[in-house]
Amino acid sequence: MKKWKWIPTKQIFQTNGQEKKKSRVAKLISDKIDFKRRAIKRNPESKVIILKGRIHQEDINIVNIYAPNIGAPKYIKKILEDFKKDIDSSTIIVGDFNTPLSKMDRSSKQNINKDIVSLNNTLEEMDFNDIYRAFHPKEAKYTFFSSVHGTFSKTDHMIGHKASLKKFKKIEIISSIISDHQGLKLETKPKGKNWKHSKL
C-alpha cells in the first residue's frame, strides 16, 4: 500500500479516480456546521477519505468508505486494520459499503457469509457497531434496490464507537434525489448539530 499524506482541507472533500478523473468519494460539510478542519487523508485507490476536525469543541474523525462491488467485506476490514491507529472513539465510519452487515439488512433475509462475519468481528473488537441497527434493532429498512436481483438491502452505513452512542439522538434513512441510494441522517443531542450523509 502506498503511503498516505496529510494535506490541507477545504469544505468539499473528494477523491478522484484515474479514469477521466472521476470523483469516487465526496464529503460535503455545510457552512451551517461549525466544523474546524485539521487534515484530510485520501487513499491511492480513491475509495477512502479520512477527515479530521472539530465540531463544537469536540474532536471528530470521519472515515468515508466506498467499497468495491466484489470483496467489499474484506476490503473494509483491511482499511480498518491498516488504519486502526487513526481510529478512536471520536470516529464515525460512513459510506457505501456495498455489503449488508446483518440478516436484517436484506429483504431476502439471507444469512450473511463468513467474510461479513469476520468484518463484524473486527468492528466488535474495536468497540464499533452499526449506529442505525443500535437504534433500530428489528426494523427492516433499506438504502438500495437491486433491479438485477429484485431485492432491497441496506448497504450504506454509519458505524460509531459504542462509547459515543450516548451523543446521538436518532438516526433515520431518508430519500435522495441525487443518488440511486437512500441517505442516512444522524442527529446528535442538543450540544451538536444534525449530520446528514448520503452517497453522491
Regions found by a protein language model. Give the residues of each.
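A shared catalytic/ligand-binding motif for oxyanion handling
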Residues: M1-L200
